[in-house]
Amino acid sequence: MGGGGDVVGALGASNLLDDLGTEWTLGGVAWERSPIDPRPGPRSLEEIRGGRPCGSAAVMTEGGTTSLDGVEFSESKMASHLGRPVLLLDITRGPAALATGIAEAAEELGCDAVVLLDVGGDVLAHGDEPGLASPLCDALVLAAGLFLARGAARTAASPEGWRGDLLGAVYGPGCDGELTPDEVLERITELQAADALLGTWGLTPEACDLVESAARAVPTEASLMAVRCARGERGSVPIRSGRRTVELTPLGALTFFFDPAAAAGSAIPLTTAVSPAASLEEAHDALMGMGVRTELDLERARAAGSHE
């Protein structure tokens, strides 16, 4: 669901699909962390250079795809690493437009299911967790997933609405240093109470190798924390230059799969809040109205500070 290094976590989870004999295509959001791209916020399609259009909200990159400022996207680096195309999503026009774009891309690629994966578990946040730092992107993308799940993403090929399967996933609970492992577990019990939890999968040695190899091409800390958990490490590890701390536990080696539509009634309040938004800014304002500060606020504050 995120940008930056989240695509590495998605690659780790793809190992499950390999074991099931299922073909897959990776994707991610055109939004790099501020140390990589100092310009705040995600990039729109008009701000992406390279790649080929794939639906109305994405481009397919095979490498060398950058912002207009020359910043190469993590998804582009992943495509070069894998030697296969990766999808790059524009989330700036809000959940409904993104859902249509994802449905169009899924049809073009021949995908009959979409898995929206969050690294860390902040997509399940309530908004009052002390460590929560990046709720906006995840909430907006999962809100697009709700449109998909409800058949509300209409395309030229599917005028009655796209009818593929839609799953949510949390990879490496607590591994981004935002929600603690205990907080993520509390949110998982909310999924269970809503009959929304579908299953759990643990990182295999092969999946760990995939993540470690990809992380040499695509900078990431959170996705690698899950590997360290799977390798049996324990303890507290600082990330983000010491601004966050990850507690390495067995929980971090797991990926939880859930039904977003079933969760929408009670377990994903931030996603529900941004669902009506017609743009990224409206989604941001919806969370701000709940008293939830987002990654966009943090990036804008950093950018303003660098220009003072």
What are these regions (language model features)?
Residues 1-8, 130-131:
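Short, glycine-rich nucleotide/cofactor-binding loops
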Residues 7-22, 26, 138-147:
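Histidine-anchored nucleotide/phosphate-binding helix
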Residues 18, 24-88:
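Glycine-rich nucleotide/cofactor/substrate-binding loop typically near the N-terminus or early
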Residues 45-69, 188-217:
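A glycine-rich helix N-cap at a beta->alpha junction
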Residues 59-99, 105, 153-162, 166-173:
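Cap/lid and interdomain-hinge subdomains that line or gate substrate/regulatory clefts
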Residues 81-148:
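Internal, conserved structured core segments that host functional sites
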Residues 122-167, 172-189:
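Conserved phosphate- and dinucleotide-binding cores of soluble alpha/beta proteins
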Residues 218-308:
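C-terminal accessory domains and tails appended to enzymatic cores
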